[in-house]
Amino acid sequence: MGNGITKNPCFSGDPYAAAVASDPLPDDSHGHSFTYVPSSAAAFDHSPRSAAASSETSYFSLSGAAISANPATSASMPSFRLYNELTWPPSTACTFESSRSFAAAPLIQAAPPRLSMSGPLHATSGRFSEASGSASTASDRFSDHPFMDGMLDRASSASSTARLMPSFSHLMSEPRVAQSGLSNERSLIRSLVRVASKLRFGVPLSGRRSNGPAEPTTKSDGDYRSTPKGNVEWAQGMAGEDRFHVAVSEEHGWVFVGIYDGFNGPDATDYLFANLYVAVHRELKGVLWDDIQGVDVVTDNLPDPALANATHLCFLDAGGVGGGGDDDPDAERKAKRGRIERNADDDGASSVHRDVLKALARALARTEEAFFAAAEERAAQSPELGLVGSCVLVMLMKGKDVYLMNVGDSRAVLARRREPDFKDIFFRPDQDLQLLKAEVMRELEAHDRNGLQCVQLTPEHSAAAEEEVRRIRSQHLTDRQAVVNGRVKGKLSVTRAFGAGYLKQPKWNDRLLEAFKVDYIGAEPYISCTPSLRHHRISSNDRFLVLSSDGLYQYFTNKEVVDQVAMFTAEQPDGDPAKHLVGELVLRAARKAGMDCRRLLEIPHGDRRNYHDDVSIIVMSFEGRIWRSSV
């Protein structure tokens, strides 16, 4: 697998050079996995003022993997199709490219026989290390993984036949070549701005409806924190109809992750890939990139540690923000007043967190507005553009603050170590000392046995959620078929999505062929692009965060995902937990179909969608309060 290094703006002589796709993955590849560990000196800190007041520093490690089930499809709009061809190699269902700080490997089917491992699991410290009590009883099947081990040597030639490395630790022990040369002087965002401008993919700026390209308002627009030499490491890929990208600035202490799970074609996901990252950056300029000083999280002195952590969780359903749709007629008024629904009675999120969440919502709303404006120009020739859509999951981490935005059924699941609960033990009157000791021991044993807790940070916008069904039916009282057979109008399982205009405006439905039309009653939208937003403050109990498209949860519960990552990383702390999850998904899909995984992987793309979906997974590890990589 190549990397397209010389073709990427981070390494080319032209700072505004368009990004070009890397060489395609090997023909026998089913997807890709990748890892990223910050340099040993990198610390994701807060503002200087807060850093001086606290010795806590955030470190993280990132693991990702994606597998495709759907074949590659062509975009409907010529400009979309051109961008698709510029970005992704033709006739490939999956591809990946990145800056050189990411270690990556294709998912290639492992050759039998596979030797079984034996012996008990032992908790081991490392990048992704936290043994879970319930996970320790799970199947020890690491050696039965359906894919080959090893990482690509990114220092080798950029051909798709680059040699496999036996261990990720070997790569990380080499000099970090990405910290030198032109990679420190170029920014991925500039290439996206440039390509978007050429292909009329611009996002209208605030207060302006634009049918043409949206150029940066200043030379610094589109560059991180207005610095001409922002050091940004990045990765991007596709798997069937899924798209994802990751951007990391160690210098300024932030991470951006976007996962876009498309349906009915690639136009919406490719548009999101080209535009949402740029739009988020523009909206956050002056809010986060300029790093407003001296703003700390409001925390009350609460007696219960679990409750104290809950005060760092704030939730805002962004109706009316940035001109988007509305679930609640009072939502815009509430948003203007800055009201935030919290998990505990607290003073509310600080203004900076509220502003970041609003900025994310505005970026998404304006990106969808621009998407429909561009699609409108080709609606007569390509009415099927009214069908295409995508789920959206965005994570932005700045220091210890994690901001999440989701539309659809992709998930962000947090793994957290629960604190032992002694409050019902120590405060009993006339407690016998021996009995007290016994109950303390039982609580500690239960704590170890229960292992990690899983917390789903993003709500699910699908017809499986009763509150979403009630919302849609309340908005369409005269339509008894608003939600039928677990789908909106019998067509779409998600209740919120980017695009999918045929369920938002009657005109898009009217343009479709009769076979694709729905019985659109009235003028109100059936689905919306109103995102759910959440801010979470990383605590000493938080271990890792799993971001993924919904295909992962076709075969896993939230708890099973957390336990699988914990079990795998306890045994293989230098391993790739996201790749392990993909391998376990293939094993479960094959078992359900009554076949072995080799036979499943031989099924062509398209037909394989009957067994599993496209899946994109990002696992981020925060090893406690102060976490350092083992490098």
UniProtKB/Swiss-Prot annotation:
Leading EC class: hydrolase
Residues involved in Mn(2+) 1 binding: 261-262
SUPFAM superfamilies per record: PP2C-like
Residues annotated to bind Mn(2+) 2: 261, 550, 613
MF GO annotations: metal ion binding; protein serine/threonine phosphatase activity
Keyword Protein transport: no
InterPro entries tied to this protein: PP2C (IPR015655), PPM-type-like_dom_sf (IPR036457), PPM-type_phosphatase-like_dom (IPR001932)
Residue segments, region Disordered: 119-142, 205-231, 324-347
Family: Belongs to the PP2C family.
One Pfam family here: PP2C
E.C. no: 3.1.3.16
Name of the featured protein: Probable protein phosphatase 2C 31
Keyword terms, alphabetized: Hydrolase, Magnesium, Manganese, Metal-binding, Protein phosphatase
Cofactors, names only: Mg(2+); Mn(2+)
Cofactor note: Binds 2 magnesium or manganese ions per subunit.
Catalytic activity as recorded in UniProt: O-phospho-L-seryl-[protein] + H2O = L-seryl-[protein] + phosphate; O-phospho-L-threonyl-[protein] + H2O = L-threonyl-[protein] + phosphate
Classification via SMART domains: PP2Cc
Biased composition (Polar residues): 131-140
Keyword field contains Hydrolase: yes
Residue ranges annotated for the PPM-type phosphatase domain, each copy included: 221-622
Organism: Oryza sativa subsp. japonica (Rice)
GO annotation (BP), single: signal transduction
